Amino acid sequence: MKKILICILSLLGLTTACGQKGFEETDVKGFAELIAGENVVVLDVRTAAEFDEAHLAGALNIDVKQGDFVEQAKASLPTDKTIAVYCRSGRRSASACEKLAAEGFRVVNLKGGILAWMDAEMPTTAE
């Protein structure tokens, strides 16, 4: 009976460990504080059309849905800076964060994406 209980608890521990993210997430306030600092690159992982409509000032755009996303990111992003990642609602940026974290980047995801950012009346640009 003890062995069965130990096996069950071990499996629960493994599934919990596998579900952990390899990146941080933050809300709009934390994201704003992060990108105001130095050693941060802001990355918008939406499509080019979405980026052209509105984005955070100074953001780079690499579409996470492109097959060569990781290769583009490795060619464009510094490994010695934090990458602050966002998309429309947070789902694509979470996917991008997983991919980038697996490549050794330090990444932070904006919970709620640019929608949350704009709901908080934070600045965007179309330039």
Q: What are the language-model segments listed below?
A:
Residues V42-D44:
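Structural scaffold elements adjacent to functional motifs in cytosolic proteins
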